[in-house]
Amino acid sequence: MARKQQFDYNEDAIQVLEGLEAVRKRPGMYIGSTDARGLHHLVYEIVDNSVDEVLAGHGDHIIVKIHKDNSISVQDRGRGMPTGMHKLGKPTPEVILTVLHAGGKFGQGGYKTSGGLHGVGASVVNALSEWLTVTIERDGFVYQQRFENGGKPVTSLEKIGKTKKTGTLTHFKPDPTMFSTTTYNFETLSERLRESAFLLKGLKIELIDERNDQREVFYYENGIEAFVAYLNEEKDVLSEVVSFEGEHHSIEVDFAFQFNDGYSENILSFVNNVRTKDGGTHESGAKTAMTRAFNEYARKVALLKEKDKNLEGTDIREGLSAIISVRIPEELLQFEGQTKGKLGTSEARSAVDAIVSEQLAYFLEENRDTATLLVKKAIKASQAREAARKAREEARSGKKRKKSEATLSGKLTPAGSRNPAKNELYLVEGDSAGGSAKQGRDRRFQAVLPLRGKVINTEKAKLADIFKNEEINTIIHAIGGGVGADFSIDDINYDKIIIMTDADTDGAHIQVLLLTFFYRYMKPLIEHGKVFIALPPLYKVSKGSGKKEIIEYAWSDEEMGDVLKKVGKGYTIQRYKGLGEMNADQLWETTMNPESRTLVRVKIDDAARVERRVTTLMGDKVEPRRKWIEKNVAFGLDEESNILENENLSVAEEV
């Protein structure tokens, strides 16, 4: 996609909106959270500024370093921050780094399209840093300024040398008093930086970890074509990667896709290089265009007869991996909702539709073998969906209702309330724990479904086999929102679906099988934050007996130390191996009572990463899984690790 330079980037292009004091008081408002996610977000803010320079046609190389002290430096070869005096009476870099919303992307400033959609930028990074140093190469000189203690300038902007280069180097150390962790994860950064490199053809991003001499270079000549190939790397594909690009009413569009033999679709969309996780008008434009083009082609070559209904979009997109990347000028940019996760610009729909329609119709004509294969696959998907719909309707109309009710009646213990907004469904491993859960639950709003048999691995199985699996069928009926393309979040019977298993490897396996099913066939459940993992305690510490007995619980070895101090000498420790070892009262108190339980909400943070992990770890190819395990799993004699030790967890109170 063409990069364009349209505006001057100088002191006058820097516009100021408000002061910086609020950031340290409410960091979550600016970076989302103060856990590992927020910590890594600081890096993305600085990198996105460098990417904006590349987008504007300046520089094509960014170097990100994790230093030994967990400080971060980001070096680009853009124009360098403007170094003159700003109209506020301070050097411009000081304004950029100390005033919130001061930057070249506000107003029609230094950038035509900018990725800093959240618009907080360098000043917020400075506010949340122990120290930050900016080094600028511009106009033949090297300039430097240092800030400490949350963005206070300790030097003015100083000339420290001469240079023939241009660019900006930002070096900062996150403030440990602001973050729950200040240790950077190489893998987390590399996934996001890889994404930035995919989206800009020819951009080279280097990630260097000085703590352990790791280094990765991301550079993709084919841009989003390489991104699609990366998503499908471990899948069996049915076509080459196809890509289209074009411009329509000043909106630039990049679209690439490839089909695999799986059953789910995976579309990732971006606006000005920033992910739109909830889709929007650009996604709808691409979907509409694909549906129209495939139907027109199918009729033209008589794969669909006159009497046949048109293929639905979901049938056509079965097995599709696609990337949509649009660049929209600031004056046209509109989002729905606060989080900017969904594009609202109506012009984007017609731009994407026009470009994809025209080029896809041409592609199908020119590649008849591939086109016919894909249309036949869609027809098969349509037939399977129709059969599933009939089966569901028969179940609803009563022909098979008795059977579906029987499937549930022996297993599901329903909640007393009929209010889906309050009700919770516990999926419990095994009958004995299921029995305790039924006795211990709050009958008003908690339903319990014990899982007796083996849950099928839905990543490997065909749709027909999945519906033959009794456990999966029972779960589908209990949740009540349908399944696959017909799933509707509005029809579900519960506000929380809670997976409760033993704290051992078998329990973890059941969790993963259920999560794979929800991810593939009820993804909106996860996207809307309805899926949770219950955390039963690992230890019970007791002292005394009868009415004087003191009982405390610990969820981790760390917590155990505090509990032992609290109980005092003469204690007895019990290590729980399974839920069945707890009686109903204990299970209620530790794992089911909303006042005292701990739940882990399942979220999708990085869609591309999740897609690849599910394919690698749950798919039918053994080799990629073996390689991943060799690279990422340390085998030892230690007890299995606790889920609470995962650095990607963020903590929130239950409401």
UniProtKB/Swiss-Prot annotation:
Give the Gene Ontology MF terms in alphabetical order: ATP binding; DNA binding; DNA negative supercoiling activity; metal ion binding
Q: Can you list the disulfide-bonded cysteine pairs?
A: none
| E.C. numbers | 5.6.2.2
Segments of skewed composition (Basic and acidic residues): 387-397
Quick one: where's region Disordered?
A: 387-419
| GO-annotated cellular components | chromosome
State the reactions this protein catalyses: ATP-dependent breakage, passage and rejoining of double-stranded DNA
Q: Which domain of life is it from?
A: Bacteria
For this protein, the record's InterPro entries field holds: DNA_gyrase_B_C (IPR002288), HATPase_C_sf (IPR036890), ParE_type2 (IPR005740), Ribosomal_Su5_D2-typ_SF (IPR020568), Ribsml_uS5_D2-typ_fold_subgr (IPR014721), Topo_IIA (IPR001241), Topo_IIA-like_dom_sf (IPR013760), Topo_IIA_B (IPR000565)
Which positions are tagged coiled coil? none
Sequence positions that bind ATP: Y9, N49, D76, G116, L117, H118, G119, V120, G121, A122, K340
Give the note describing cofactor binding and stoichiometry: Binds two Mg(2+) per subunit. The magnesium ions form salt bridges with both the protein and the DNA. Can also accept other divalent metal cations, such as Mn(2+) or Ca(2+).
Which keywords are on file for this protein?
A: ATP-binding, DNA-binding, Isomerase, Magnesium, Metal-binding, Nucleotide-binding, Topoisomerase
The Gene Ontology biological process terms listed for this entry are:
chromosome segregation; DNA topological change
Which residues of the sequence carry a binding annotation for Mg(2+) 2? D502, D504
Family to which the UniProt record says this protein belongs? Belongs to the type II topoisomerase family. ParE type 2 subfamily.
Self-association and partners: Heterotetramer composed of ParC and ParE.
Name of the featured protein: DNA topoisomerase 4 subunit B
